[in-house]
């Protein structure tokens, strides 16, 4: 009998497959395609301190092997989630990973307190947000700010805190080390790569916001490389994501160092992607006589 259970930050996941925040709504939207209980856990849509309507359309643009998005964190706000959505999700046999974004350290701390009083299993902190008190620079690009933010939020969180890293940095390992030093329980990566698509007839960007985050298979090699580098640099467990489309992709991320792997853009193509992914992982384990999925984490051998 093979074991696919993963202990991540003290939380047991029945399998290593989760969803990337922003690609799975609040889970219930996918119930007509597949039960959310098929997943070890899922990343809920990103939350902010107050409700947000998001950016003006167009907000999505298809690209070769991926999509660009600038949805702008449209969401009902953390308090609405805590009072009206999480009680419903708590009835499902799966772990909920709440994702939060803030404009100030104080906002992050307030949201951590609110989410800590719910049944979420893990709090994921998106640091790819502008710090309005420091000229709008993104939180996740400065190691000192990442350390300060993580340390502050950790004091207000009763749940394991996972910091979501941006790939749009000079050195992702330095950011990872800063989050670890600040007290993070785990890390997730990668967030989207910044990109642009221009209409050659109008000479204007397709997206109303001009730029957006690139996701999908196009980013997978970058994500795998960054997972490997961060796994070598810190001792924290990792959630890997970026262009996962099948079971082989999941295995590749785990070999690079991820303990959990998130499906994201692939769900827009195949909403029930979790089903063939789980089957392919099972077949891989049987083929190579792997009894425990944990045994392959971070075992890729460099040349």
Describe the function of each predicted region.
Residues 1-96, 102:
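N-terminal capping/small domains of soluble enzymes
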Residues 36, 54-64, 198-212, 254, ...:
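C-terminal helical cap(s) of enzyme catalytic domains, especially alpha/beta-barrels
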Residues 48-53, 130-132, 194-197, 268-270:
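Short gly/pro/ser/thr-enriched loop/turn and capping motifs at secondary-structure boundaries
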Residues 103-239, 248-256, 260-263:
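Alpha/beta enzyme core
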């Amino acid at each position: 009998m093979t074991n696919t259970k993963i202990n991540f930050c003290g939380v047991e996941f029945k399998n290593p497959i989760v969803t990337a925040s922003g690609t799975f709504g609040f889970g219930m939207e996918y119930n007509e395609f597949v039960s959310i209980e098929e997943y070890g856990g899922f990343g809920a849509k990103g939350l902010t301190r107050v409700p947000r309507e998001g950016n003006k359309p167009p907000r999505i643009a298809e690209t070769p092997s991926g999509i660009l998005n600038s949805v702008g964190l449209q969401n009902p706000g953390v308090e609405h989630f805590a009072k009206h959505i999480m009680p419903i999700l708590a009835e499902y046999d799966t772990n909920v990973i709440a994702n939060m974004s803030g404009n100030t350290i104080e906002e992050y701390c307030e949201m951590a307190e609110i989410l800590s009083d719910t049944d979420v299993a893990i709090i994921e902190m998106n640091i790819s947000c502008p710090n309005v008190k420091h000229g709008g620079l993104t939180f996740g690009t400065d190691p000192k700010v990442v350390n300060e933010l993580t340390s502050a939020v950790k004091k207000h969180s009763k749940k394991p805190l996972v910091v979501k890293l941006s790939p749009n940095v000079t050195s992702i390992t330095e950011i990872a080390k800063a989050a670890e030093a600040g007290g993070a329980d785990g890390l997730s990566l990668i967030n989207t790569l910044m990109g642009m698509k221009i209409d050659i007839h109008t000479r204007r960007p397709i997206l109303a916001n001009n730029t957006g985050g690139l996701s999908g298979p196009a980013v997978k090699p970058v994500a795998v490389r960054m997972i490997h580098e961060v796994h070598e640099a810190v001792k924290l467990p990792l959630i890997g994501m970026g262009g996962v489309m099948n079971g082989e992709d999941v295995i590749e991320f785990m070999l690079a160092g991820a303990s959990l792997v998130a499906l994201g853009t692939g769900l827009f193509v195949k909403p029930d992607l979790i089903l063939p992914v789980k089957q392919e992982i099972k077949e891989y384990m049987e083929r190579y006589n792997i009894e425990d999925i944990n045994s392959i984490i971070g075992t890729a051998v460099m040349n």
